[in-house]
Regions:
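Charged interaction scaffolds used for protein-protein
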Residues: 1-11, 34, 40-45, 52, ...
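Short, surface-exposed, low-complexity cationic segments
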Residues: 18-38
Length: 143
């Protein structure tokens, strides 16, 4: 997944692929896929809690941020920028230096939320389950 993001009026190219996971691991000493799963689990639990408490219509982005905080989303945006830069021989500022210079922090973090959603949707199965497929021989038998 490759895209361009505008932060503080500056365009950044982002890239999410296998290399992203190794850069994330090297820079943050954490596993990206485990962190993504943890974010999803916390989000699901927060939705269930809101439903139990009579708040089923709360903004899902707010619920996601409230359940997980902003650090993961900061990291996700930065590591996707760093991945792109790595493939194109560019330098990326150190994570904390990069984040410290962001003027529009809310937009930066929300970009991470959108990227997470795209990553999750990009990894969903797009092929029909083989057990659900109907072969031409099966169709003939049904007639």
């Amino acid at each position: 997944m490759e895209q361009t993001l505008s932060i503080d009026g500056k365009k950044y190219n982002l890239l999410y692929k296998g290399k992203t996971a190794s850069i994330y691991r090297d820079c943050f000493n954490r596993d990206l896929l485990v962190d993504i799963q943890e974010v999803q689990i916390k989000f699901g639990e927060a939705i269930e809690k809101n439903v139990r408490e009579g708040n089923p219509d709360r903004d899902p982005y707010f619920v996601l941020l409230q359940a997980n905080g902003s650090l993961f989303f900061e990291r996700l945006v930065w590591v996707c920028i760093k991945t792109y830069d790595t493939y194109h021989g560019k330098e990326t500022k150190a994570f904390q230096d990069f984040v410290d210079e962001i003027e529009n922090y809310e937009t930066y973090v929300m970009s991470g939320v959108v990227i997470l959603e795209q990553v999750i949707n990009a990894n969903k199965a797009t092929v029909q389950n083989e057990s659900d497929e109907v072969t031409s021989d099966d169709k003939k038998k049904e007639v």
